[in-house]
Structures are given as structure tokens and as C-alpha cells.
């Protein structure tokens, strides 16, 4: 048997065993918490029209922006390999300065205050 067939067989077998165990284990000692679906901390059986915290939304957007910043700056060390590393440094500094100015503006406007 060649290597790819062996790996595929092991993968399918392991997946089937783990899926069977995951369906079998909660039924050994059923509990209301085990049988209920989990949706990000929200009650799935409650009203869908509950108010959503705008502060939480703004903090989540800020997190996404700075997460994107990290993703944009990760290839920066490879930018030194280019023919013009100075241009790479200028652009990365501009991105960092723009995001820092945005963070300072958000901070001064009180957008990062969780409770007033």
C-alpha cells in the first residue's frame, strides 16, 4: 500500500471514530447544558430582537483593525529583500502612523471607555 492511501485511510478512520465518540459521550449523562446549543453566550431560545451593545461593537471593530494591521505588517521583514527597502519602511511607517492617529482620536473621543 502506498503512503497516500495509508494516510487517507488513517484520516478517515480517525475522523469516524472521533465523530462517533462525540455523539456518544453526551448521551451517557444527559444534562440541559449539554443538550442545548451554544451561540456565543446568547440565549438561542430568547428573543432575536434584544438590544446589542454599541460599545462592544466598536471595540470589536477596533480589534479587527489592529488585527488587520498585524497581517499587513507581518511581511515587513521580507520587504528588506526588495530593491528599495527605504520605500517599504516609509509605507509601513505611514500605515503605523495612520493607525496610531486613529487610535488616539478614538481614545480622545471616549470611544474606548467601556462604562461612562
UniProtKB/Swiss-Prot annotation:
It is found in: Mitochondrion membrane. Pfam families: Oxidored_q4. Belongs to the complex I subunit 3 family. GO terms for molecular function: NADH dehydrogenase (ubiquinone) activity. The keyword Calcium does not apply. This is NADH-ubiquinone oxidoreductase chain 3. Gene3D superfamilies: NADH:ubiquinone/plastoquinone oxidoreductase, chain 3. Keywords: Electron transport, Membrane, Mitochondrion, NAD, Respiratory chain, Translocase, Transmembrane, Transmembrane helix, Transport, Ubiquinone. InterPro entries: NADH_UbQ/plastoQ_OxRdtase_su3, NDAH_ubi_oxred_su3_sf. Core subunit of the mitochondrial membrane respiratory chain NADH dehydrogenase (Complex I) that is believed to belong to the minimal assembly required for catalysis. Complex I functions in the transfer of electrons from NADH to the respiratory chain. The immediate electron acceptor for the enzyme is believed to be ubiquinone. The keyword Membrane applies. It comes from Oncorhynchus keta (Chum salmon). It comes from the Eukaryota. One of its GO terms (cellular component) is mitochondrial membrane. The gene is MT-ND3. The chain crosses the membrane at residues 3-23, 56-76, 87-107.
